[in-house]
Amino acid sequence: MASRMGFEPGFLVLESGYGDDSDAALRQDIIHVTGSQFISGHVQEVVDAVLLWWRDDDGDLVDALVDVLAYLTDGGPIWVLTPKVGRRNHVEPSDIQDAAPTAGLSQTSTLSVAADWSATRLVARKASKR
């Protein structure tokens, strides 16, 4: 699944929102493909991608997106991982659709990445040409 999500060897990945309910197999697959452990906490470097585990009771999604966007390389994706429909703390897709443009992001795709988790890919919007 990590390769399908666009992760490549050598990628530095910032992980935010990790919890006991996060999917261990997906995390291990990403670590295996990239060859690197996740970066978390206070970041001092630019990362190639962000993995943001997000649940309905986690607070303001716009704030979380803006926070992680500061560390992301140009063109790098933010993968917002949310519990699937019917799972505890499910996030409505419209919540992501509403938050993304406010944070300066565009939604590009959504994948089923684990039994309990969906992943929505967000990227920075391109500046409009004049």
Question: What residue spans do the PLM features occupy?
Answer:
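S-adenosyl-L-methionine-dependent methyltransferase catalytic core, i.e., the SAM/SAH-binding region
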Residues: 1-130
